[in-house]
Amino acid sequence: MAAARNATPTPQNGRDASRLSFAKITDTLTVPDLLALQTESFDWLVGSDAWKRRVEEGTKQGRTDLALNSGLEEIFEEISPIEDLGETMQLGFTNPYLEEQKYSIDECKERGKTYSAPLYVEAEFMNHLTGEIKTQTVFMGDFPLMTEKGTFIINGTERVVVSQLVRSPGVYFERQQEKTSDKDIYSARVIPSRGAWLEFEIDKRDQVGVRIDRKRKQSVTVFLKALGLTSEQILEEFKGVASIELTLEKDSILTKEEALKDIYRKLRPGEQVAAEAARALLDNFYFNPKRYDLAKVGRYKINRKLGIDKQLTDSVLTVEDILATIKYLVSLHANETKMNGTRDGKPVELRLDVDDIDHFGNRRIRAVGELIQNQVRTGLSRMERVVRERMTTQDIEAITPQTLINVRPVVAAIKEFFGTSQLSQFMDQNNPLAGLTHKRRLSALGPGGLSRERAGVEVRDVHPSHYGRMCPIETPEGPNIGLIGSLASFARINSFGFIETPYRRVVDGVVTDQIDYLTASEEDEFLVAQANAPLTKDFRFAEDRVLVRPKGGEVELVAKENVHYMDVSPRQMVSVATSLIPFLEHDDANRALMGANMQRQAVPLLRSESPLVGTGMEGYAAIDAGDVLTADASGVVAEVSAEVVTIQLDEGGTQTYYLRKFDRSNQGTSYNHRVLVSAGDRIEAGEVIADGPATENGELALGKNLLVAFMPWEGHNFEDAIILSQNLVKDDTLSSIHIEEYEVDARDTKLGKEEITRDLPNVSPELLADLDERGIIRIGAEVRPGDILVGKVTPKGETELSAEERLLRAIFNEKSREVRDTSLKVPHGEQGTIIGVKVFDSQDGDDELGSGVNQRVVVFIAQKRKITEGDKLAGRHGNKGVISKILPVEDMPFLADGTPVDVILNPLGIPGRMNFGQVLETHLGWSAKQGWEVEGKPKWAERLPDHARQAPAGTKVATPVFDGALEEEIAGLLDSTTVTRDGDRLIGSSGKTRLFDGRSGEPFPEPVSVGYMYILKLHHLVDDKIHARSTGPYSMITQQPLGGKAQFGGQRFGEMEVWALEAYGAAYALQELLTIKSDDILGRVKVYEAIVKGENIQEPGIPESFKVLIKEMQSLCLNVEVLSADGQAVSLRDTDDEVFRAAEELGINISTRFESSSIDDI
């Protein structure tokens, strides 16, 4: 994936992807593999070769924190051995391994299967009584595999497992103000990965208390005595600590036995106390590895915090840990600042401090591997219960590992995780960036995380420790703001799950090339300079005092000798999507957030075009997203077609690459590969062979470079509305292809088999014209709403046949059988061209269609959507708007040389929103499009790189985030742009020019800002939103039309709209809306009848909602009656017969569109 990691790509075969960069700082580190977060975690889980190589390299470098066992090995080791209650036999598991996968990725997508491999494990059964050992290899179910792109294919759909941000296990100290007095109350919590919490607290009376498993508080000295310490030992340990001495004085318990019983009483009130049971209870809580697990990370955090040197594999608490926690707590309470401890075998002085729970040193990532591992653990513990049960019930002689093990719980747990977990999500495949960002997402929600309702502002807020780890900008707007983030560009995750970010080591004021990855806790101990701190030629700081970031996030100036580290890149604090926004430094953060989010909604266009003004991240993002085909090895292209590229490899042999043509993505956009190479071309490893959707020459290309003018135009661009030129429609500049998939099953019903056929009852031959002899539509047919895609008939209930009918049936081979037409038709509001048909038949044997399904037909319809009024466009700076008018090209304002502009934007969209990046982008875009040449040595060009002093027309430029082109450089380049044929320079350093009105040819009174801006077409397309209904489904209770396009619903006419009609006195319009157009059941059938027969419409009846109201009032014991004018009670019951009679006469049955029990039709 990350093969193409050369800083300056060499142009080959005319495929030049290099950009002219305005960067002043050279990156010491190239962008890492952006999918490593997913792939490395899964490699560890299954123990792949790549993971083994990484462990080998790490061991050579002397790293001790790496896991030496794969995730699956760990978990089977943890559960082994399973023993029966009498400990007479045991079952152990070793060496889990995966066999070859059953289906390829493409087969899984086509057939709706899961991309997985069978998991096997060696099981060993031992009978202690006879010493007999039986070993077998046992199948543990199919284990879903990750594709190269970091996704899973579950039941044919591509899914992503999002990494979770959770509180790390460890020990935490807190300070809170006591409500009544102003005293500080200190507390400590020991939080394990699994098991009971242990909490200590010093109250306002200076008593030290302990809570076991969140139950009642009790004295800490009782707890210590229960652990085996005597009063003398406690006094010895806490010499001179007043709070402990005070607590001990009030404690009347003397022996360990009494202490255990006292704790048992408080934990299990009302039960008989036995000393043995009391001891077992405490052991099970904190000292039994089956019940309590700190995990390596918890042990690591406790060691670091309390200055203890225990092995990382010690996963349970020890008395030493508990004593150290209490010592730390009482020292905090006594306002001490330092304490002695040991780290890595050396004595150290620890800084005493309370913990910040939102600090990234206390929050860790649970990546894919760990999430699946936890799920397998759940499945295995369920299986463990079954194994124990079977050990006691089966005949000892006949027991084998196979008879004991039931893999169903394990398979079910994995299936449940991938199918229903909050963290296993339907992949966002709108464009390559959407997929890449989805895989790099960090979520604080999900099982074991936070919930939206409980999360306060502090958790959601940006924290200083996020720097270089989680993007402060890219997060959703709405209820999830701050709970879902995105991993920063250079960040990586260490073996404990903490996010690390790279820094350049500074030694005695000299910046070295050594790169250290630091976690948030480690970084707190150092002073870090920013990446753009000026350096001399020998990499020393140019200034005596350097701006640094100490702990706490506030910046300060320090002497250069005191600096420890320096950022590796100016863009290391932002995520991939944010680093694609040029001039981000000139945008308000709220708008940058919208810009980062809206790039993910851009639809791949018919012809992709990479931005004139980029940031240099486009290539990295496109290649790592995996939608661009790159060469695995060097060679020469032997054969090229639209679907296959074959390469003759240098080391011998050939390699074939298959391209995807017009596939449907998860979001219904077109996924299509376009070949970039020709036969005979030389290809190096990592070079681009074919572009995917929304990429050009291996660079991300989400939108189009369009000529924009910032000016008001007849009020048509009021409130962010956008005016476009007809040229963009005519030339298909902003057209996109959308593909929908429809399927139909032929099943076995109680009355017989459904049949896919062309022979449909009461259907005219014109409607069957595009169906083949099987009754399936032909490829290439143009279809409109209501057209038949697949002909299907379903048997009706049969009556007893007479002899004549039976004879007819025998002669005509059952042709006169009673069937109804249940064909698949094009839904309302859809149309397009048939581009593919797939037929699956259960008789072929290899297609497992599910029970009762004989045949399945899948039809793909593609439609080309041109840009139209109502579509949403956006720039990369959060500047979004809806197209209000498409003007003929002759009416558009034009430049002095006659060039009409493409887009007119409202200048009022800029000052209030404070996203000035778009203006700078527009000016630089103009210079890049025209080309430039800098003459002489002007002052503004001093910091320009040498290669940027001249550029031909159409040069693609890069202006990296926080290190891009300066304002004076842009103004200077505008003055240096290439002149037109007439020797004119259309736009000067002001960035403005005189525009002429296309309608009159007169110049506009004021100069207008004109230039090239990169504009995206977003997925909010008007064709998907527009909707109309005449008749359709009604709600069961109220009998009013349903709401929303998906339900084919009506338009809500609410309370305020009723007031408006009342104000106009439009009584008849109002009456119709509230009765016959809504829920007057009898009335609406009669209206239909009257319209069909051409009669006058009758008086409306009583709406159903009025009857519901009366029923509700009667249920409140109010006797409500409706009286006629003469005082007689009126019955509100309709005669159903009347409705049915009218409906039958008209032959209307509109209920076929929605066959649902909760819906009634007219």
Curated annotation (Swiss-Prot):
Q: Subunit comment for this entry?
A: The RNAP catalytic core consists of 2 alpha, 1 beta, 1 beta' and 1 omega subunit. When a sigma factor is associated with the core the holoenzyme is formed, which can initiate transcription.
State the family it belongs to: Belongs to the RNA polymerase beta chain family.
Entry EC no(s): 2.7.7.6
SUPFAM superfamilies for the chain? beta and beta-prime subunits of DNA dependent RNA-polymerase
State the protein's name.
DNA-directed RNA polymerase subunit beta
Name the source organism. Answer: Clavibacter sepedonicus (Clavibacter michiganensis subsp. sepedonicus)
Question: Which cellular component appears as one GO term in the record?
Answer: DNA-directed RNA polymerase complex
Tell me one GO molecular function of this protein.
Answer: ribonucleoside binding
Q: What does this protein do?
A: DNA-dependent RNA polymerase catalyzes the transcription of DNA into RNA using the four ribonucleoside triphosphates as substrates.
Keyword list (alphabetical) reads: DNA-directed RNA polymerase, Nucleotidyltransferase, Transcription, Transferase
Instruction: Please indicate which superkingdom the organism of origin belongs to.
Output: Bacteria
